[in-house]
């Protein structure tokens, strides 16, 4: 009996949320930084697949990736709703981790004007800015690769977008601003992730969904500023600022005790309202 239990446990990883990895044709990372950029593809069961795909850009301050919470758990949730999840391993700046971080100024949500052009990066420096650009190239390559495999993966080419968490939101925003037709997302969602560079809204900007917490310093103000940039350009944007609960947000138990735990349901409802899922 014990042998049977052990054998069944060995097969658990193979039957739970199987995924494939694909390397991206982008620049190799610097020595000591991250692994080669790649995507991990999590596909829903074919009988519930609705043709929508989301490239997940995990957070981690551009120094690590919050993979378990922002990709693995989120992919499982999305697959349950028939959505393909594409985890993105993008360029990082790991070599900066041992140098310490200067404490940035703390900007309250009531002062979005503190971030002209919605640039909420409190500590610009050459190496950090270049990493953001490299990560944005990875994100654009991810969208292109999903479109190339769209028929194989049962994905609609006009239903591929981003969901960025924290720094990953900044990566997704940067990618959206400089994308060509093949790289352009159909939608852009950022969860407590403001822009890390000056925002220039593209002429054909995708619909934007923003979620954040009111008392999140810098982030909330930066995201209000991002919303305003999108609206000033005449683009479609929706902003949700939660007043309670802890952030940043990952998938939460639905206890009914906070409003922040409803963000994942809000995401699904928004995708339905925009016609990306049935």
Q: Which functions belong to the PLM regions below?
A:
Residues 1-21:
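Bacterial Sec-dependent N-terminal signal peptides
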Residues 37, 42, 236-278:
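C-terminal catalytic histidine-bearing segment of alpha/beta-hydrolase fold enzymes
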Residues 45, 60, 166, 214-216:
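Residue-level signal for short, function-critical loop segments
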Residues 26-54, 59-153:
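Serine-hydrolase catalytic machinery in alpha/beta-hydrolase-like enzymes
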Residues 133-205:
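Primarily recognizes the serine-hydrolase "nucleophile elbow" in alpha/beta-hydrolase
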Residues 53-57, 85-89, 159-164, 173, ...:
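Structural recognition of the beta-strand scaffold that forms the well-ordered cores
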Residues 74-82, 226-231, 271:
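Hydrophobic alpha-helical packing residues
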Residues 186-243:
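The feature captures the conserved acid-bearing segment of alpha/beta-hydrolase catalytic domains
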């Amino acid at each position: 009996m014990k042998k049977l239990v052990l054998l069944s446990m060995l097969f658990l990883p193979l039957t739970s949320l199987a995924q494939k990895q694909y390397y991206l044709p982008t620049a190799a990372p610097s020595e000591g930084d991250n692994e080669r950029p790649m995507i991990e593809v999590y596909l829903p069961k074919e009988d519930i697949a609705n043709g929508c795909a989301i490239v997940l850009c995990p957070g981690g301050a551009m120094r690590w990736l919050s993979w378990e919470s922002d990709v693995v758990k989120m992919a499982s949730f999305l697959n349950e709703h028939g959505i393909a999840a594409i985890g993105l391993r993008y360029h990082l700046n790991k070599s900066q981790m041992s140098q310490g971080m200067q404490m940035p100024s703390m900007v309250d949500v009531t002062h979005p004007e503190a971030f002209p052009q919605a640039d909420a990066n409190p500590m610009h420096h050459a190496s950090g800015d270049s990493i953001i650009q490299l990560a944005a190239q990875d994100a654009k390559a991810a969208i292109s690769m999903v479109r190339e495999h769209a028929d194989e993966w049962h994905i609609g080419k006009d239903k591929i977008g981003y969901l960025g968490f924290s720094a990953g939101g900044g990566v997704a925003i940067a990618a959206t601003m400089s994308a060509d037709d093949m790289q352009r997302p159909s939608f852009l969602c950022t969860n407590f992730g403001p822009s890390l560079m000056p925002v220039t809204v593209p002429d054909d900007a995708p619909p934007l969904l923003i979620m954040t917490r009111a008392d999140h310093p810098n982030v909330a103000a930066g995201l209000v500023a991002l919303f305003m940039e999108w609206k000033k350009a005449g683009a479609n944007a929706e902003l949700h600022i939660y007043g309670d609960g802890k952030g940043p947000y990952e998938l939460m138990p639905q206890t009914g005790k906070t409003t922040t735990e409803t963000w994942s349901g809000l995401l699904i409802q928004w995708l339905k309202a925009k016609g990306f899922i049935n």
